Amino acid sequence: MMMSRRIQTAALVAALMIPAAASAQMRRGGPRGGPPFGGSLNNPPLADSEAEKRILDVAAQVERYLSVPPEDGRLIRILTEAAGAKRAVEIGTSTGYSGLWFALALQKTGGTLTTFEYDPGRAATARENFRKAGVEKIVTVIVGDAHDTVKQLAGPVDIVFIDADKPGYRDYLDKVLPLVRPGGLILAHNISGRESNPEYVDAVAGNPALETILVNGQMAVTLKKR
């Protein structure tokens, strides 16, 4: 079990390094001064099954209402699948875009997503998008104030994604952290710039049981070490 978790952690670290390495390579102009490398990495992902194609098709339709950039959605998918996640939690469903990226991974790992949304209209739209994508059986949408409804959760949880009211990030962290398993991940969106919550940053940066890295300039990825 311990070796398996070490392998998973190594895979996650590699997944985090790939975007940064590719970006640096493109800025340098490619190996040995050759043509720029990595342009094709900006293309949409290729589906390896009809189930994936269905999810990706719906995600492409939802993009105009997206709450996270596509590259962050792909990061969610990579981290979730690399972790072999069985239980994923999302605080801030919106219209379901990021949830679809979770679903791409979870239909491979055999996992489920519980996602919390404050607005009933957005929750209804998300449910319809999950139905169109054929993933409604692995996604549960809970409507209400997540500061209260998240108390329904029981552990262990493998990965959490927080993309809701920014002043509430610290409270969400305090509620979900005890539920996250050792080796689990907490992702927090819009963590830098004007929208950032200093209390959240201080909480993850000052906890010796956590290790945090900023990815794509706005996604804080936190590993729960123990």
Feature locations, PLM:
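N-terminal secretory signal peptides that target proteins for export/translocation
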Residues: 1-4
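N-terminal export leaders
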Residues: 6-13
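Short, linear, compositionally biased motifs with a strong N-terminal bias
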Residues: 14-16, 56
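N-terminal signal peptide c-region/cleavage motif recognized by signal peptidases
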Residues: 19-21
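A short alpha-helical cap/connector motif
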Residues: 24-161, 166-187, 191-226
